[in-house]
A protein has these predicted regions:
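Acidic beta-to-alpha connecting loop that harbors the catalytic carboxylate
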Residues: 29, 224-226, 250-252
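Conserved hydrolase catalytic core segment
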Residues: 85-128
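Short beta-strand/loop motif that positions the catalytic acidic residue
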Residues: 214, 220-222
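Conserved alpha/beta-hydrolase "acid-adjacent" motif
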Residues: 226-232
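Catalytic active-site module of serine/aspartate enzymes centered on a nucleophile-bearing elbow/loop
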Residues: 240-273
């Protein structure tokens, strides 16, 4: 599904068929709205509605010179189009800063924040512009993208190649969702290059919002075996005014979300309800 924003750009989105408090999901990198589909069963169990969209440059969402704050504005416009006033927000991995940016910019609309497997903000920016950083990363990214070959119309083969690039524990949990979901995720994540490269470039420099401006209750979720996210967790808990930390035993990066969906949604749904 897609919507047209006021400036003419397209946002591709997905909504669960459930009813209840809305949880707005910000995907990781390389990732898409389809990661929210892995929480569909948990949404039914808990009684919440999931809403997720592809950031600019992913899938059919129009590329633009986006930042964390502009993506938060896109999310607010999407909610306006749906007539949704208040939401809980969930950010997976690189989506964590985007979810926090929304919570900081729209405190009156945000009931709770979940930051899952998210990185910390760097202290200093590298030399050059965001576009310079994107250009530097492009050759390595394009070589990796070429190995996955997102233009392959065989979902089974595409899903297999994408899963092979993930940590074994993450791939084992994602594979059962099927080639349609996984292959579609890989295609939307990689068919265009701007989304991934811009996400990576933005992650390498200080963000254009202050995490300390988040006013809602927040939970930082990390996996015990996700070393980078575990190391970043204190950065988040020390800056978010109302933060709790949850460490999922024996889980890696994506596995933290996939195994903790019910617990995450219960906490968000309670705050939203």
């Amino acid at each position: 599904m897609k919507v047209s924003l006021a400036d003419g750009r397209i946002l591709r989105y997905w909504s669960s068929a459930t009813t209840g408090p809305v949880v707005l999901v910000f995907h990781g990198c390389p990732d898409t709205r389809r990661v929210a589909m892995t929480g569909d069963a948990a949404a039914h169990e808990v009684g919440v509605r999931l809403l997720a969209f592809n950031r600019p440059g992913y899938g059919s969402s129009t590329p633009t010179d986006s930042t964390h704050t502009t993506v938060a504005r896109d999310a607010a416009e999407l909610l306006d189009l749906w007539g949704i006033e208040r939401v809980a927000v969930l950010g997976m991995s690189v989506g964590g800063p985007y979810a926090a940016a929304f919570a900081a910019a729209y405190p009156h609309r945000t009931t709770a924040l979940a930051v899952v497997s998210a990185p910390a903000m760097p202290r200093e920016a590298p030399e050059g512009t965001i576009e310079d950083a994107m250009a530097r990363m492009a050759p390595e990214f394009l070589a990796w993208r070429g190995r996955i070959d997102p233009d392959d119309e065989d979902d089974e083969a595409l899903a297999a190649r994408f899963l092979a690039e993930l940590p074994e524990a993450d791939a084992a949990l994602l594979a059962p969702y099927g080639a349609d979901l996984v292959g579609g995720l890989a295609w939307e994540a990689l068919v265009e290059t701007d989304g991934y490269l811009r996400d990576a470039a933005l992650l390498m420099r200080p963000w254009d919002f202050d995490v300390a401006d988040v006013r809602c209750p927040a939970t930082v979720w990390v996996g015990e075996d996700d070393a980078k996210a575990l190391a970043a967790a204190p950065w988040w808990t020390n800056r978010l005014p109302q933060a709790a930390l949850e460490v999922a035993p024996g889980t890696t990066h994506l596995a933290t979300l996939l195994t903790q969906w019910p617990a995450i949604l219960r906490r968000l749904g309670t705050a939203t309800g």
